[in-house]
Amino acid sequence: MKILFVLISILYAVYCFSSEEDVDSAYLANELEPVEDINSEQYAALEPKEEQERSCADMGQDRKDDCDCCLNIATCNCWFGRYFCSCTFGDYQTCLRKKGKCKRNRPQSCPRSNLNRKKG
């Protein structure tokens, strides 16, 4: 049984190597036809466009001012004074401050927390 398995393995290996040589020789002789991409027209419109810089930054991205952060309650938090600034979560007061000073990315409305309301 082991001998039969070894013989079949050897025959298969010889077959694989001989078929690779046929394909390689045909490729080198340019006998193979080029493969046409069927979906080439479909993806022609999906070519990547040049990326434009956003006017605001998401949480964690580097920015220099509160007005550069996207969310209404986002604030620009800087370490060591003015270095390593990034957008982090702020509060209602942050939103009011942005509403007064920002000309771009100005908040339309400031969300109020439901924690301070009395129930009952």
Swiss-Prot record:
Assigned GO CC terms: extracellular region
Q: Where is the Agouti domain?
A: 56-95
According to the UniProt record, which cysteines are disulfide-bonded? C56-C70, C69-C87, C78-C85
Query: Signal peptide span per the entry?
Result: 1-16
Cell compartment(s), UniProt: Secreted
Q: Which residues form a coiled coil?
A: none
Its PTM note reads: Contains 5 disulfide bonds.
Q: State which tissues express it.
A: Expressed by the venom gland.
- Keyword annotations: Disulfide bond, Secreted, Signal, Toxin
Note the pro-peptide positions: 17-54
Q: Single GO molecular-function term?
A: toxin activity
- Protein family per UniProt: Belongs to the neurotoxin 05 (agouti) family.
This protein's name: U13-lycotoxin-Ls1c
